[in-house]
């Protein structure tokens, strides 16, 4: 699943150009060993856990990822820049749960949208993830996406923000 991907030079959802330092795919946490097997010999995999990066050098199925680890970072070698920030999602076969607040969940089939055969994380779900830090690029993404969100997506984001981030600045605009 890809949560943010360029189509040509443009964002898949908004059609707006915005430079990216990396690509942020999302995978279910349960698929980490499959990802590591697939990338073996191509990209180094590092766990990002509470601000600490740790190279995952062992066999894909032999090294557990702590439950507190939210992301894997990938690059060709320790001397190369990061290429991918892989977001680990908490899922069951039927349900996605927001990693920062387990009171927020959705049926797994409703967190994605598809364009040209590629699955993307729905923009309202991506914006919920971005709401935590409010970097300038996250505020820009919100401003660009907000007018494009359908009423149910806006309402879902508003409800989720009220639960996870009461008083968030985006609530006024939603």
Language model region names:
Residues 1-174:
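Compositionally biased terminal segments of proteins
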């Amino acid at each position: 699943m890809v949560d943010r991907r360029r189509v040509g030079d443009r964002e898949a959802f908004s059609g707006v150009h915005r430079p990216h330092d990396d690509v942020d795919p999302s995978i279910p946490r349960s698929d980490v060993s499959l990802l590591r097997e697939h990338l073996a010999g191509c990209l180094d995999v590092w766990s990002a856990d509470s601000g600490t990066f740790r190279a995952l050098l062992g066999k894909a199925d032999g090294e557990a990822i702590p439950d507190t680890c939210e992301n894997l970072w990938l690059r060709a070698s320790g001397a190369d820049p990061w290429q991918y920030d892989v977001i680990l999602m908490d899922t069951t076969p039927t349900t996605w749960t927001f990693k920062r607040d387990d009171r927020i969940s959705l049926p797994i089939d409703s967190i994605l949208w598809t364009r040209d055969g590629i699955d993307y994380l729905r923009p309202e779900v991506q914006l919920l993830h971005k709401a935590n830090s409010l970097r300038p690029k996250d505020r820009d993404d919100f401003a660009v996406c907000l007018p494009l969100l359908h009423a149910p997506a806006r309402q879902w984001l508003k409800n989720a923000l009220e639960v996870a981030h009461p008083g968030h600045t985006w609530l006024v605009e939603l």
